[in-house]
Amino acid sequence: MKGRFGRFGGQYVPETVMNALIELEREFEEAKKDEKFMEEYRYYLKEYSGRPTPLYYAENLTKRLGGAKIYLKREDLNHTGAHKINNVLGQVLLAKRMGKKRIIAETGAGQHGVATATAAAMFGMECEIFMGEEDIKRQALNVFRMKLLGAKVTAVTSGTRTLKDAVNEAIRDWVTNIETTFYVIGSVVGPHPYPTMVRDFQRVIGDETKEQILEKEGRLPDYVVACVGGGSNAMGIFYPFIEDKGVKLVGVEAAGEGIETGKHASAMAKGSVGVLHGMMTYLLQDEEGKILPVHSISAGLDYPGVGPEHAYLKEIGRAEYVYATDEEALAAFMDLSRTEGIIPALESAHALAYAMKLAKKLDEDKIIVVNLSGRGDKDVNTVAKVMGVEL
């Protein structure tokens, strides 16, 4: 069935949204086959975002841990500081192709909002970003950044006032303004065609990584490790390696204060199958199917679900999903900053925390690639607060 990954995915949406999804899928399929569109997309990735991003051998870190070689895929070096721009450029170009005048998006950490506002500014489109009131408090800098870029930021005060509520609000707006408006989803979530479309715009990460590691090591890595919230950075780096059975794919979720505390965001470890935001996937929900509150030190990972293709990769055993706590992520954040002079996003620090544990157990001839999905500038306030430092 179309838009399904095994039993996951699908289009669990009201009739009103269905027509928009059908139109979107048609346009996306056509655009993908259109060499001119793809050429324009690649042009902006290179000239505007600065791709390809380096695959960096973290020599200091590797030597200190004394195990497997650690390479970092430097998505933090993209324009706007994370992998988000890869997908946003693709979707905004698609919106332009479809003749839409207005761009809307949801955002949690604010990174996807900033990337969307950035692309909208460049293409001269009106932009509105929906953001949970709680997240607005946590991410004041990103909120101001979006406003600087000309976007309107709308606070969402319903529900838990976080990412999931922002998504609901954005969908509501989209349905009302379908003629003029394009909804840019920031992760491999939502109803079909979004999970596929976002993956296709993010796979550039894995395509580059494959080429780069072959050039540097003459072989593929033993492990590819990435953090998973919705899971677009992970899907982007995993996808080109799926057929390479010798490469182990590891997604790292946020265990928050601990997987047994109820204050975490590990849908794979603790969730059950259900429907949210138009897709069937693993969700953190109670017996009645009510979505549970989630927690992570990193705003970008506190999503109560996970992309349906990840759910499928877990089910067929092609990828493994583990988790790292707030504390472990913080330690990795500090570690990379001091060892390599790279301040990672707290999201990426979850992947790094697991990779560091893993590296110690492996022989020196093994290779681990970690997707460093974003830079940590946005998290400096959070980390300072945890350390009791007044800024």
UniProtKB/Swiss-Prot annotation:
Keywords: Amino-acid biosynthesis, Aromatic amino acid biosynthesis, Lyase, Pyridoxal phosphate, Tryptophan biosynthesis. It is an enzyme of class 4 (lyase). SUPFAM superfamilies: Tryptophan synthase beta subunit-like PLP-dependent enzymes. Pfam families: PALP. Pathway: Amino-acid biosynthesis; L-tryptophan biosynthesis; L-tryptophan from chorismate: step 5/5. Its EC number is 4.2.1.20. One of its GO terms (cellular component) is cytoplasm. Belongs to the TrpB family. This is Tryptophan synthase beta chain. The lineage of its organism: Bacteria, Bacillati, Bacillota, Clostridia, Thermoanaerobacterales.
